[in-house]
Structures are given as structure tokens and as C-alpha cells.
């Protein structure tokens, strides 16, 4: 699919500052888009925030999280048919991040990406899990024998992935990881996404996120 760029002629002054704040990473807005056939850059008018996002703007940890997830969404979401379920999930997740205490956001990106898989059609077959099985990242299923390719998790990693399938925005703060383990989990998730979407290895915000969490 092709990418669509939105240009906002905000100008300068107080109104420009307000508009730029609305259009921050993961900003949820209602607007009028001037979409014209044959153009790759489209105009944007009358942006209006659908709910307050002051915490997302003001908290550096949440802001870094938002920048990373916005970059991921820019790669996996392409022009196509409207998907109300996906929209409601993303909006609900952003609202949850906005309302969440800052000290509880460390696992948000892990939870978001795992649950996003369902709406992208790449959700692992969690029902196929069994003790001693390994997770085949290409077929998105658990199996007893190693596949011919190298994209699979060890039995211990596979068990850990299954345990993560129970994570949601309400209980994710109960999953206690140190920075090294959290980065290993994120690396595995990004490897999984990379098998289904190109460009995941070059995310600019990934290293920044790893330094914070």
C-alpha cells in the first residue's frame, strides 16, 4: 500500500502551538482532511482533540512510549477499508495510557503490541500451547519439534510468551521485569512483527525506549 502524509499549515502563535499539541504522536483528533486523488500530501483543517491528552504530552515516559508505538503503527497500518474494531482498540489503549499513573507504564508497549496482533490477523495460536512445546514464529503456532527455519523460541521462551498472552492493561503492572528481560521480550516481539511487516528493524525510537524501560 501507499503512504499518506498530512500537512497542517499551523503557522505560528498560540493557535499553532495548540494544533501542534493535538498532532503529537498518538494524538486522537477529529479533523477535515483535504484528500485529492493523485496527491501524496493532503491538507488538514479544523483539528479537534476527542479527549484530553495532557498527561501524554507532559510525561516524558509516556511521550517516548507514544513516539515508539506511533512509529510501529505507521508501518503496520496502511490505507484500506475502515476497521472499527482496530480503531476502538487503539483509541481505548491511548485513553488507558493517558489515565495510567506514570510508574505503571513500563509494560504498556509490550501489552499493546501483543494485543494488537489480533486486529492485524497475526495473533499467535495460544490454544496450541503445551508444556515442552516451542513457538514457531512463522506459522504463529506451538509445536513439539523445531521447524526447518530459525525463527522460533526455546521451550522456556515459549512458555514465557504464553504467560504474556494473559497480560492486559489492567494487570500488566503486576508483571515484574528488569530492564534486560523487558528488552529481551520486546526484541522477540519485534522479531515476530518483522516476519510479517517490513521495516521493523530500523525504528528510530526503539533505542530511546530501551534506555527508559
Cite the ranges covered by each PLM segment.
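Non-catalytic alpha-helical scaffolds and adjoining flexible linkers that form interface surfaces
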Residues: 2, 7-213
Amino acid at each position: 500500500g501507499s503512504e499518506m502524509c498530512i500537512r497542517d499549515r499551523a503557522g505560528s502563535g498560540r493557535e499553532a502551538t495548540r494544533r501542534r499539541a493535538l498532532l503529537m504522536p498518538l494524538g486522537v483528533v477529529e479533523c477535515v482532511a483535504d484528500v485529492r486523488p493523485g496527491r501524496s500530501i493532503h491538507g488538514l483543517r479544523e483539528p479537534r482533540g476527542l479527549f484530553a491528552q495532557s498527561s501524554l504530552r507532559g510525561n516524558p515516559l509516556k511521550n517516548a512510549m507514544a513516539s515508539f508505538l506511533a512509529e510501529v503503527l505507521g508501518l503496520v497500518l496502511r490505507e484500506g477499508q475502515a476497521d472499527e474494531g482496530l480503531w476502538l482498540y487503539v483509541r481505548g489503549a491511548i485513553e488507558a495510557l493517558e489515565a495510567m499513573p506514570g510508574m505503571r507504564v513500563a509494560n504498556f508497549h509490550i501489552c499493546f503490541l501483543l494485543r494488537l496482533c489480533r486486529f492485524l490477523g497475526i495473533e499467535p495460536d495460544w490454544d496450541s500451547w503445551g508444556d515442552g512445546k516451542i513457538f514457531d514464529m512463522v506459522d504463529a503456532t506451538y509445536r513439539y519439534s523445531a521447524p526447518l527455519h530459525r525463527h522460533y523460541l526455546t521451550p522456556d521462551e515459549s512458555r514465557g510468551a504464553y504467560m504474556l498472552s494473559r497480560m492486559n492493561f489492567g494487570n500488566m503492572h503486576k508483571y515484574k521485569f528488569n530492564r534486560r528481560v523487558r528488552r529481551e521480550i520486546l526484541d522477540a516481539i519485534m522479531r515476530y512483527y518483522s516476519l510479517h511487516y517490513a521495516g521493523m528493524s530500523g525504528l528510530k525510537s526503539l533505542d530511546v525506549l530501551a534506555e527508559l524501560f
